[in-house]
């Protein structure tokens, strides 16, 4: 999976994912599914923002080629991908400037046109189930939720999809391509199935002979990106329990 991620995603996205996992004490060579999940979520966030600007009249426009003479402002502020300190600094700055209510949880984007924070979700499950889970957690009408699936489905707050159909189609196509490429390499099942992921994690630990250097305690912290993506394959409690079950060295 690690090789696939490095081949499939932009190096900048891979680097950001590596930093996120390192910040939370996660080993990408072992937890390769998380590595892939973070990269996927980051790419969707960046694609959401790509080419969208606000012109001098305050209108939202799509510009694919930069015009140095155009006075354009990026429509979206990207919050995801920053370390927690910087991310909250950006959020506080936005709130002070726009008067927006400060969210309880770190969002992924801020939309300067609609003046709202956006939470992006990516899931392999039914989008409405994941949407309800996200809404129940956030419990704020001021944060807009937009969920995408690997099957081309999507769901958003009040059926307001924010982006034009073509922009959303690019995201859906990319997710479908990622799914197909994983399937072609025999990686899809382990990416989305807890049972298969457990087998893969055990295989990774065994093949790398990491037992001697493994920590004795399991980190319970969850990175910001994984708050969105973790349900794609397992929840945090199962992740911690799974990791703990493999941290025991075999008796000599």
Swiss-Prot record:
Main location: host cell
N-terminal signal peptide: none
Superkingdom of this protein's organism: Viruses
A single BP term in Gene Ontology: viral RNA genome replication
Pfam families: Flu_PA
Example of a GO MF term: RNA binding
Marked site (Important for efficient shutoff activity) residue numbers: 28, 65, 202-203, 206
Protein family (similarity comment): Belongs to the influenza viruses PA-X family.
Its job: Plays a major role in the shutoff of the host protein expression by cleaving mRNAs probably via an endonuclease activity. This host shutoff allows the virus to escape from the host antiviral response. Hijacks host RNA splicing machinery to selectively target host RNAs containing introns for destruction. This may explain the preferential degradation of RNAs that have undergone co- or post-transcriptional processing.
Protein name: Protein PA-X
Organism of origin: Influenza A virus (strain A/Hong Kong/5/1983 H3N2)
């Amino acid at each position: 999976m690690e090789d696939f991620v490095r081949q499939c995603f932009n190096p900048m996205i891979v680097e950001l994912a590596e930093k996120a996992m390192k910040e939370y004490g996660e080993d990408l060579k072992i937890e390769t599914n998380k590595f892939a999940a973070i990269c996927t979520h980051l790419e969707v966030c960046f694609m959401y923002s790509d080419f969208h600007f606000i012109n001098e009249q305050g209108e939202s426009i799509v510009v694919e080629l930069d015009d140095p003479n155009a006075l354009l402002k990026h429509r979206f502020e990207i919050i995801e991908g920053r370390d927690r300190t910087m991310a909250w600094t950006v959020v506080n700055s936005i709130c002070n400037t726009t008067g927006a209510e400060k969210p309880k949880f770190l969002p992924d984007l801020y939309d300067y046109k609609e003046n709202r924070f956006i939470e992006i979700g990516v899931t392999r499950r039914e989008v409405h189930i994941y949407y309800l889970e996200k809404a129940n957690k956030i419990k704020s009408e001021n944060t807009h939720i937009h969920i995408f699936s690997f099957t081309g489905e999507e769901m958003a707050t009040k059926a307001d999809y924010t982006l034009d159909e073509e922009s959303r189609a690019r995201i859906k196509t990319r997710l479908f391509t990622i799914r197909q490429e994983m399937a072609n390499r025999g990686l899809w099942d382990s990416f989305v199935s807890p049972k298969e992921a457990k087998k893969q994690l055990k295989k990774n630990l065994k093949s790398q002979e990491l037992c001697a250097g493994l920590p004795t305690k399991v980190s319970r912290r969850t990175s910001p990106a994984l708050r969105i993506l973790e349900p794609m394959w397992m929840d945090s409690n199962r992740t911690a329990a799974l990791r703990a079950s493999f941290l025991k060295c075999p008796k000599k």
